[in-house]
Protein backbone atom coordinates (compact mmCIF):
# COMPACT_ATOMS: atom_id res chain seq x y z
CA UNK A 1 0.00 0.00 0.00
CA UNK A 2 1.46 3.33 -1.05
CA UNK A 3 1.03 6.45 1.05
CA UNK A 4 1.95 10.12 1.41
CA UNK A 5 2.98 9.95 5.07
CA UNK A 6 6.63 10.88 4.49
CA UNK A 7 5.69 13.94 2.42
CA UNK A 8 3.07 15.04 4.96
CA UNK A 9 5.46 14.51 7.88
CA UNK A 10 8.30 16.39 6.23
CA UNK A 11 5.94 19.17 5.15
CA UNK A 12 4.92 19.57 8.78
CA UNK A 13 8.59 19.73 9.84
CA UNK A 14 8.33 16.57 11.94
CA UNK A 15 10.87 13.83 12.51
CA UNK A 16 9.76 10.21 12.46
CA UNK A 17 10.29 10.14 16.23
CA UNK A 18 8.12 13.22 16.80
CA UNK A 19 5.30 11.86 14.66
CA UNK A 20 5.54 8.48 16.36
CA UNK A 21 5.28 10.12 19.78
CA UNK A 22 2.24 12.16 18.72
CA UNK A 23 0.54 9.03 17.33
CA UNK A 24 1.52 6.75 20.22
CA UNK A 25 3.51 4.31 18.07
CA UNK A 26 7.21 3.53 17.66
CA UNK A 27 9.52 5.33 15.26
CA UNK A 28 10.05 1.97 13.57
CA UNK A 29 6.30 1.73 12.91
CA UNK A 30 6.30 5.15 11.23
CA UNK A 31 9.33 4.13 9.15
CA UNK A 32 7.70 0.84 8.12
CA UNK A 33 4.49 2.62 7.09
CA UNK A 34 6.40 5.26 5.11
CA UNK A 35 8.36 2.63 3.20
CA UNK A 36 5.29 0.49 2.52
CA UNK A 37 6.54 -2.51 4.47
CA UNK A 38 3.63 -2.25 6.91
CA UNK A 39 0.00 -1.34 6.28
CA UNK A 40 -1.44 0.32 9.37
CA UNK A 41 -4.57 -0.94 11.09
CA UNK A 42 -7.75 0.92 10.23
CA UNK A 43 -7.80 2.76 13.59
CA UNK A 44 -4.19 3.91 13.07
CA UNK A 45 -4.89 4.95 9.47
CA UNK A 46 -7.85 7.03 10.66
CA UNK A 47 -5.74 8.56 13.44
CA UNK A 48 -3.05 9.50 10.92
CA UNK A 49 -5.62 11.01 8.57
CA UNK A 50 -7.11 13.10 11.36
CA UNK A 51 -3.66 14.17 12.52
CA UNK A 52 -2.83 15.54 9.06
CA UNK A 53 -6.40 16.77 8.43
CA UNK A 54 -6.81 14.56 5.38
CA UNK A 55 -9.06 11.66 4.47
CA UNK A 56 -7.70 8.12 4.61
CA UNK A 57 -8.12 7.98 0.82
CA UNK A 58 -5.95 11.08 0.38
CA UNK A 59 -3.10 9.44 2.29
CA UNK A 60 -3.25 5.73 1.49
CA UNK A 61 -3.39 4.30 -2.04
CA UNK A 62 -3.80 0.66 -3.02
CA UNK A 63 -1.04 -0.61 -5.33
CA UNK A 64 -2.42 -1.24 -8.78
Regions found by a protein language model. Give the residues of each.
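Short basic helix-loop element that most often maps to the first helix and adjoining turn
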Residues: 3-22
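Short amphipathic helical patch at the helix-1/turn junction of helix-turn-helix
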Residues: 10, 38-39
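Key DNA-contact positions within bacterial/archaeal DNA-binding proteins
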Residues: 17, 28, 57
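Recognition helix of helix-turn-helix/homeodomain-like DNA-binding domains
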Residues: 25-38
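DNA major-groove recognition helix of helix-turn-helix/homeodomain DNA-binding modules
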Residues: 43-58
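Short amphipathic recognition helices of helix-turn-helix/homeodomain-type DNA-binding modules
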Residues: 58-64
Amino acid sequence: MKNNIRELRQGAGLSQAALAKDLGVSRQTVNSIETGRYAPSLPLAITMARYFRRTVEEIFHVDE
